[in-house]
Design a protein with these regions (language model features):
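Structural/interface elements that position substrates and couple domains in central-metabolism enzymes
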Residues: 1-255
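A short, hydrophobic C-terminal helix/tail in secreted or cell-surface proteins
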Residues: 256-260
Length: 260
């Protein structure tokens, strides 16, 4: 199985490196030639503990490659993971230009049936729009199936978050896409949650929002504890024994998370 990863930022590079670490043959595509040459030396362009070692080990083993030649990469691809950025526009909406630029490259160059997987955080319904884009723009008579596979990583722990994920969410609309992604992720040994694409997109936003809600709540409780002379860690510990609220570790962890 030839896997291609579009984009070598936090999401794309960590995804590609970890797939190679699991034994898959992976080609990471980026438009920046200097960046590609640096990665071929086993040096990550982003700081992430453990990533340099994974890049170096798997590049030398021949499981991981880096290229700017997207035409050749997509022609040989069986699965393409899209992990490019979706920066915020001035009006607050997500800029999907990079996503659709990659889709244009895939549509122009793909020569075989392929599963295209969106790892990037995108608005609800984007996978459906990508599917329509391929129907209208693909150059060859091939099957292109779209899947949503949101990431749940954090900077500084991205490698651990990927290799030891709490769960792997797969949003699909066909048995073929489900079978392909399940066959890839079963070696991770983590729970695989299979949903439709819109549910997978929503799981990403709902998870982020719920965590933000918990952080806001515990911060307010910390402020109140300071006013009344209580100890927030003792309060969190006392709350944690209630199974409806959560365990001690998760509550104390939230106390240490940055608020920005």
């Amino acid at each position: 199985m030839n896997i291609v990863v579009a984009g070598t930022g936090y999401v794309g590079l960590v995804t590609g490196a970890c797939l190679a670490e699991k034994g898959f043959c992976v080609t990471c595509v980026d438009v920046d030639e200097k960046k590609v040459e640096v990665m071929k030396q086993g040096i990550s362009p982003i700081y992430e503990p453990g990533l340099d070692e994974i890049l170096d080990r798997n590049y030398k083993a021949g499981r991981l490659d880096f290229t700017t030649d997207y035409e050749s990469a997509y022609q040989k691809a069986d699965v393409v993971f899209i992990g490019v950025g979706t920066p915020e526009r001035e009006d607050g909406s997500a800029n999907l230009d990079y996503v659709f630029a990659v889709c244009e490259q895939i549509a122009t160059n793909v020569t075989r049936d392929v599963v295209v997987v969106l790892k990037s955080t995108v608005p609800i319904g984007t996978n459906d729009k990508v599917e329509e884009f391929f129907k209208e723009n693909k150059k060859q008579d091939v099957r292109i199936e779209i899947a949503s596979n949101p990431e749940f990583l954090a900077q500084g722990t991205a490698v651990i978050d990927t290799l030891h994920a709490s769960r792997i969410v797969i949003g699909v609309e066909s048995d073929w896409a489900k079978d392909v992604l399940t066959s890839i992720y079963q070696c991770y040994g983590q729970p695989i949650v299979v949903t439709n694409r819109r549910s997978a997109e929503m799981i990403k936003y709902a998870s982020n929002d719920f965590l933000a809600l918990k952080i806001s709540f515990i911060n307010e409780m910390a402020n109140l504890c300071e006013i009344v002379g209580a100890d927030i860690e003792e309060v969190a510990n006392g709350m944690s024994f209630d199974p409806r609220i959560g365990n001690k570790l998760s509550l104390i962890h939230i106390l240490t998370l940055p608020t920005n």
